[in-house]
Curated annotation (Swiss-Prot):
The chain crosses the membrane at residues 51-82, 91-111, 141-160, 161-180, 236-255, 282-310, 325-342, 400-420, 421-440, 500-520. Ca(2+) binds at E259, E261, D278, E281. GO terms for molecular function: chloride channel activity; metal ion binding; voltage-gated chloride channel activity. Homodimer. Interacts with BSND. Disulfide bonds: none annotated. Residues 1-50, 521-687 are cytoplasmic. Keywords: Calcium, CBS domain, Cell membrane, Chloride, Chloride channel, Ion channel, Ion transport, Membrane, Metal-binding, Repeat, Transmembrane, Transmembrane helix, Transport, Voltage-gated channel. Specifically expressed in the kidney, predominantly in the outer medulla and cortex. All nephron segments expressing BSND also express CLCNK proteins. This is Chloride channel protein ClC-Kb. It comes from the Eukaryota. The gene is Clcnkb.
Length: 687
């Protein structure tokens, strides 16, 4: 029946299946279909990618806002239960601890039961994917559902566990971008393109940051610094477009829900604009950056060492392998018990939410000077108008609570990063850096109670400005990024401290990048993800080492004149993804590349036996339609390690063949590059 055709009515007279003509209302259906085709042609004239970028930004903003809305209600319910349960310490302790324990156990169990790749931040995996490596299941839609549910439960624990959502949201946004890329391919009818896919994934990473902090500019720059060593200008513009759409939609939803009167910054500050800081304070901001850089080295080293310890220890490794919810519950009990307000939690402002932590830390006034002559009593409930009093306790000074917070949260944050749940780790270190800056600013305000005199004018010390600089410097040093300075400006709406904050971030990064890998690179090292290490410094001699010193000389080639039996033996005995194709066995002149999958399919179509004297060779298989690829890029024996590393990073390569006067003599892959860089960085001891 489908082979029968009729004539379409009208002037075109195009043949159509009779089944279409026999359907109900054929003329109306044809008109609607024609109208949709016309609309599609007009809309896609400007480029279909832009519509999918708008959809990406809007979808992620809706998910982010819906998650914030739901989590806010759940956190308020927990606080209400804690207040209304009475004065019994046992019941209040149980209401404070059982809640996060149950949520984290469910988050771990649910996400891990669906897919193990849903745990953690997700940024290290996204960073690996953007280099061209295919990681199975990391961009599947089932991983998206597990990540959303698990992350919602994690964030519902509030400041008790002290975790954020930046990393998982980058992962979620990249998953949405991958899905929209597949929809785009089917809609437009184009063949799948790896380049197009990577463009959308890069834009998705920027949207993930922008929809968390409603900060499009720093969102794009942060995603570039964290996840790319080289970045295309074309992706730069697309990332800004999608991130702006997401941030605008996020602000718009807040205005429509009466949470904001208009589009404004997330954290309100009121730094003076006339003379926000004096010239001598530049030295203090740089010193603060140096302190943050030193502490970030200790944090990254301790966190990575603790992860290695958990993997090496028999008990914890077995617990994490077989009973992840139990490990999550045990860690939650420890963290919740320490933050219990009537216990030691009242020395670390545990009754404040993470947003309230930042709002109080960015306060202009000096708490040390305000409480110098009087010690305010510890209120039974936080005063919404004086939340900064949560940092003041009669038994400790402001300095005592800030120092206690830094000491306790240092190892508590490290413990929280080991819990196998979907969670972000950027906001906790951002707050930790703000506390460092606040402590530094309070010390200066006591050292200079009247302010700094310069040019005949007295300028008071503002600890809130140092908290802002500390947040940007410490988080930037931990992640090896400079865009955290711009992020601090966007979330506070203040640019008056642009120069000192940027100088603090530069000082912190100068120290941290010299001694330790970033937080995300450390996770890549621990998880053993396929990722190229950086070549740091010129002293290691990467320009003097050539490809001939570290290439893989055991190269398996396929010659066009090779008999089919030998070709089959080569395919069976090796497991490489592609074979270099040479002209003849004697010449070994490299002429192309044949993929293993294509070669296996071609061999399967060949007959099982041949007549005597008629056995074909590889040339016959290629002539029958087995596709080959040209060698567009190859290395010579004199190419330096530094140039090879740059090529692999810039073009997202996995393997390159080495030729000498046209002859294939070896290959270089990530394995050889890693070994060569490791040998230069850590040379073997002389015997």
């Amino acid at each position: 029946m489908e082979e029968l055709v009729g004539l379409r009515e009208g002037a075109s007279k195009k043949p159509v299946p009779l089944q279409e003509l026999w359907g109900p209302c054929p003329r109306i259906r044809r008109n609607i279909q024609g109208g949709l085709e016309w609309l599609k042609e007009r809309l896609f004239r400007v480029g279909e990618d832009w519509y999918f970028l708008v959809a990406l930004g809007v979808l992620m903003a809706l998910i982010s806002y819906a998650m914030n809305f739901t989590i806010g209600r759940v956190v308020r319910a927990h606080k209400w239960l804690y207040r209304e349960i009475g004065d019994g310490h046992l019941l209040r302790y149980l209401s404070w601890t059982v809640y996060p324990v149950a949520l984290l156990s469910f988050s771990s169990g649910f996400s891990q039961s669906i897919t193990p790749s849903s745990g953690g931040s997700g940024i290290p995996e996204v960073k690996t994917i953007l280099t061209g490596v295919v990681l199975e299941d990391y961009l599947d839609i089932k991983n998206f559902g597990a990540k959303v549910v698990g992350l919602s439960c994690t964030l519902a624990t509030g400041s008790t566990i002290f975790l954020g959502k930046l990393g998982p949201f980058v992962h979620l946004s990249v998953m949405i971008a991958a899905y929209l890329g597949r929809v785009r391919t089917k809609t437009v009818g184009e063949p799948e393109s790896k380049t197009k896919e990577m463009e959308l994934l890069a834009a998705g990473a920027a949207v993930g940051v922008a929809t968390v902090f409603a900060a499009p500019i720093s969102g794009v720059l942060f995603s570039i610094e964290v996840m790319s060593s080289h970045f295309s200008v074309w992706d730069y513009w697309r990332g800004f477009f999608a991130a702006t759409c997401g941030a605008f939609m996020f602000h718009l939803l807040a205005v429509f829900n009466n949470e904001q009167e208009t589009i404004t910054s997330i954290y309100k500050t009121s730094f003076p604009v006339d003379i926000p800081f004096d010239l001598p304070e530049i030295f203090f901001f740089v010193a603060l950056g140096a302190i943050c850089g030193i502490l970030s080295c200790g944090y990254n080293y301790s966190q990575r060492t603790f992860l290695f310890f958990l993997k090496a220890n028999g008990f914890t490794s077995k617990l994490l392998a077989t009973s992840k919810p139990l490990y999550s519950a045990l860690a939650a009990v420890v963290l919740a018990s320490i933050t219990y307000p009537p216990g030691v939690g009242h020395f670390m402002a545990s009754r404040l939410s993470m947003s309230e932590h930042l709002e109080t830390l960015f306060d202009n006034n000096s708490w040390a000077l305000m409480t110098k002559n009087s010690s305010p009593p510890w209120a039974a409930e936080p005063d919404p108008q004086k939340l900064w009093l949560e940092w003041c306790h009669p038994q400790l000074t402001v300095f005592g609570t800030l120092v206690f917070f830094l000491v306790m949260k240092f190892w508590m944050l490290i413990l929280a990063t080991t819990i196998p749940i979907p969670a972000g780790y950027f906001l906790p270190i951002f707050i930790y850096g703000a506390v460092i800056g606040r402590l530094f600013g309070e010390v200066l305000s006591v050292a200079f109670p009247e302010g700094i005199v310069a040019g005949g004018r007295v300028n008071p010390i503002m600890p809130g400005a140092y908290a802002l600089a500390g947040a940007a410097a410490f988080s930037g040093a931990v992640t090896h990024t400079l865009s955290t300075a711009l992020l601090a400006f966007e979330v506070t709406g203040q640019l008056v401290h642009a120069l000192p904050v940027l100088m603090a971030v530069l000082a912190a990064n100068a120290i941290s990048q010299s001694f330790q890998p970033s937080f995300y690179d450390g996770t890549i090292i621990v998880k053993k993800l396929p990722y190229l290490p950086w070549i740091r410094g010129r002293q290691i001699g990467s320009h003097s080492v050539t490809v001939g010193h570290f290439m893989n000389c055991a190269l398996t080639t396929l010659a066009k004149d090779m008999p089919l039996e030998q070709v089959i033996q080569v395919v069976i005995s090796t497991d490489v993804t592609q074979y270099p194709l040479v002209e003849t066995t004697e010449s070994q002149t490299l002429v192309g590349v044949v993929k293993r999958t294509h070669l296996v399919q071609a061999l399967q179509t060949e007959p099982a036996s041949w007549a005597p004297g008629q056995q074909p060779c590889l040339q016959d298989i290629l002539a029958n339609g087995c596709p080959t690829q040209p060698v567009t890029l190859q290395l010579s024996l004199e190419t330096s390690l530094h140039e090879t590393h740059n090529l692999f990073e810039l073009l997202n390569l996995q393997t390159l063949f080495v030729t000498s006067r046209g002859r294939a003599v070896g290959s270089v892959s990530w394995v050889e590059l890693k070994k060569a860089i490791s040998t230069l960085t850590n040379p073997p001891a002389p015997k």
